[in-house]
Regions:
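HotDog/MaoC-like acyl-thioester-processing domains
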Residues: 1-2, 82, 87-152
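Hot-dog-fold acyl-thioester-processing enzymes
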Residues: 1-82, 149-152
């Protein structure tokens, strides 16, 4: 698949209800034992929006409606590159959010061994489902390590 085929692709809109259980489990997995995550109206941990894009996507071959599985193949490994978050307000338990993910940039770098690295930058804009006010934008870079061709 050519890199240019994916740039600008949008994965559609997904709806997420932030529930206390997943927030608590996520905080515990990070080793964050702050009591604030045990409350009924708890805020989410700072990196929690990353996992929201994957809710409901297991077994679908994608995340947030994007064709992640189409990037896999022989000699290709998917790596987590970078992530960042722009908060407009802090999400919390009870929020119902709608997120739209777009691939905003694609590029590649050649490696000295004949392989290459492909970079896919995505942005997921999460909005309040009722007011449509922006809540958080999650920016994520997916890296595909493409091994060099093997001699036959």
């Amino acid at each position: 698949m050519a890199l240019t085929e994916l740039k600008g692709q949008t994965g559609g809109t997904q709806r997420v209800v932030i529930e206390r259980g997943p927030v608590r489990v996520f905080a515990e997995a990070l080793g964050d034992t702050d009591d604030v995550y045990q409350q009924d109206e708890a805020p989410v941990p700072p990196t929690f929006p990353f996992v929201m894009s994957y809710w409901g996507s297991f077994g679908t071959g994608g995340a947030a409606g994007l064709p992640i599985e189409r990037l896999r193949g022989p000699g290709r490994a998917i790596l987590h590159g970078e992530q960042a978050f722009e908060y407009h307000r802090w999400p919390e338990v009870g929020d119902v959010l709608e997120g739209t993910t777009t691939i905003t940039d694609v590029y590649e770098k050649e490696r000295s061994n004949g392989g290459k690295l492909e970079f896919y930058v995505t942005e997921t804009a999460w909005r309040d489902a009722t007011t449509q006010d922006p809540v958080v934008t999650a920016i994520f870079t997916l890296v595909i390590n493409v091994r060099p061709p093997q001699p036959s």
